[in-house]
């Protein structure tokens, strides 16, 4: 094979390779002049228009065209408007490069086009290679947006589940310890003193003591009676008409001004019990996040 034949073959191969490297937008189903393609930063996009006809390229809605570099500004007008770029050729153009830069919140993008134009007697949709509109799609961006939305939904769902769990735990803690029932609770209490302070019920489950008062009375101050007979302020919480104390004592003293009432635990166990739940209640178990088992 002669050197001239090798040169011609190499040129033909280069031309074929270059043609394959260009990305031709896909024709629309209703009108082939409407074209669509997915963005690929490594591809040259082919644009084909007619002399005197306007061609618009549409980029992502969050992009703004910032720079346009054309090879022949005399015969090819380029007008950017937001995420749109309009072209209009005044003369026949052989394929020539156009470089476009866009900016968005996520950064800058580069687009490389190869645009050409030809003279056409009419501009109907039967004309081959006549583009009126080229619109980009962004599958990678859409997939990333779906992933972000899924992650955000997962976070919202997790926070919602945690809030529900927290509300259930708070509701449970706000309830008096009556879930064990009468057979498991100690009701053996006797009162001594001013009965105007007398609660309707007093009971314990071995861990917590509950005083149940009428709903419209003022709740007195409650003190535990130590073995030496001295008083100590009881740490209690008021839940509606119930007062819950996270301990059991042999005796309690209720005071409201000079009015005093003593309540004695007739079945008091000085050894006591442990709930084995990590809390002061047998019906509320402490669970550490991330703990096994």
Swiss-Prot record:
UniProt key word Signal: yes
Recorded family membership: Belongs to the TrbG/VirB9 family.
Protein name: Protein virB9
Signal peptide extent: 1-21
Localization terms from the record: Cell membrane
Complexes and interactors: Heterodimer of virB7 and virB9; disulfide-linked.
Membrane topology, from the record: Peripheral membrane protein
Cellular compartments per GO CC: plasma membrane
Xref: InterPro entries: Conjugal_tfr_TrbG/VirB9/CagX, VirB9, VirB9/CagX/TrbG_C, VirB9/CagX/TrbG_C_sf
Gene, per the UniProt record: virB9
NCBIfam families: PRK13861.1, VirB9
CDD domains associated with the record: VirB9_CagX_TrbG (cd06911)
